[in-house]
């Protein structure tokens, strides 16, 4: 690795650390009293805007940023099978969760669907951009010991640890589910050589919970 590449990698790693710390503090940013009593929508917009700004900076700094960070179209023939598999697993998980914890299916009220679907889409894109694109891509580019498998595991665990609310409230089901989701989406990204299928898959998992257990989860964001 040349000096210029090493310098670019160091800067990209620094920005990535800030990006991950931003994810750790995302709930406080989006629910800040400063925004809540003025423009409630400004908190989420500020957070997602910062994520995109950091991501753009890292893409431009890292050599061949789009390629190394999986910001390319999916390999032909990979997206549909991967998404179908995620849809099936997401639906089965949501049904099992609904019956295990709530005794039956309780869908999200239709009046709440537009805002929740928009939030789910934004969350899926931001999380996958942060962890499956940037963190995973940088770990692989840096050549950490253990190779691709270690990179997938590390980013999945880091993604789980970033769920501060789940840790604080000891919601072990969702915490373990977050790590498993991060691990699965990591391999989806590697398989498709693109983060796009992981974004869609993440969105499918969240919307499955809305469809089968959203009526009881509506007071708590997923």
Regions found by a protein language model. Give the residues of each.
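C-terminal ends of transmembrane helices
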Residues: 24-33, 93-106, 159-170, 208-215
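Alpha-helical transmembrane segments of integral membrane proteins
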Residues: 6-14, 42-50, 80-84, 88, ...
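Juxtamembrane helix-loop-helix connectors linking adjacent transmembrane helices
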Residues: 32-42, 59-129, 136-146, 216-222
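Sequence-level detector for tyrosine residue identity
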Residues: 34-39, 47-48, 102, 159, ...
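Transmembrane helix-loop-helix hairpins at the membrane interface
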Residues: 18-20, 113-222
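N-terminal, membrane-interfacial amphipathic/helix-forming hydrophobic leader that caps
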Residues: 1-70, 150-153, 207-222
């Amino acid at each position: 690795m040349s000096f210029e590449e090493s310098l670019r990698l160091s800067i990209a790693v620094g920005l990535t650390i800030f990006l991950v710390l931003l994810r750790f503090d995302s709930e406080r940013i989006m629910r800040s009293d400063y925004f809540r009593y003025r423009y409630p929508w400004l908190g989420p917009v500020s957070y997602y805007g910062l994520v995109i700004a950091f991501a753009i900076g890292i893409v431009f700094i890292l050599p061949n940023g789009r390629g190394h960070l999986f910001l390319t179209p999916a390999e032909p023939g990979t997206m549909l099978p991967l998404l179908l598999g995620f849809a099936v697993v997401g639906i089965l998980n949501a049904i099992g969760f609904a019956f295990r914890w709530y005794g039956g299916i309780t869908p999200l009220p239709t009046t709440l669907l537009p805002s929740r679907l928009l939030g789910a889409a934004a969350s899926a894109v931001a999380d996958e951009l942060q962890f499956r694109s940037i963190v995973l891509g940088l770990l692989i580019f840096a050549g950490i010991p253990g190779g691709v498998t270690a990179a997938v595991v590390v980013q999945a665990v880091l993604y789980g640890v970033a769920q501060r609310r789940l840790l604080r409230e000891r919601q072990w089901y969702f915490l373990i589910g977050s790590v498993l989701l991060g691990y699965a989406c990591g391999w989806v990204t590697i398989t498709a050589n693109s983060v796009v299928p992981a974004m869609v898959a993440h969105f499918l998992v969240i919307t499955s919970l809305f469809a089968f257990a959203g009526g009881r989860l509506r007071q708590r964001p997923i």
